[in-house]
Amino acid sequence: MAHSLKSATFLIESRIADAARGDCNACYDLGIIYSTGASGTAIDLIEAHKWFNLAAVWGSEAAQSCRSDIAEDMTAREIAEAQRQARAWLVQTGRRAA
């Protein structure tokens, strides 16, 4: 179990680093990880929505679809929080929406 947790942590950290460099696919992958609980990661729809939102603003149609799908299972407050986190991440990393 500890090995898979280390693997999941490494995967997430490496995809976040890629996302910070502007990799749209990394954002999409993070959305998938958090929306499905891949690699033993806890499902977190706010975090998933944040990453799908970032991938979507950089042009990923698949992320737009996934974001819409998970939004059906979220409250308006949760969606607003995910959007706030996405904006904060853009500011923090100096990235801009496409």
Where are these regions (language model features)?
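Structural signature of tandem alpha-helical TPR/SEL1-like repeats
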Residues: S4-S14, T41-K50, R77-E81
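Amphipathic, hydrophobic secondary-structure cores in small proteins
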Residues: I43, E47-C66
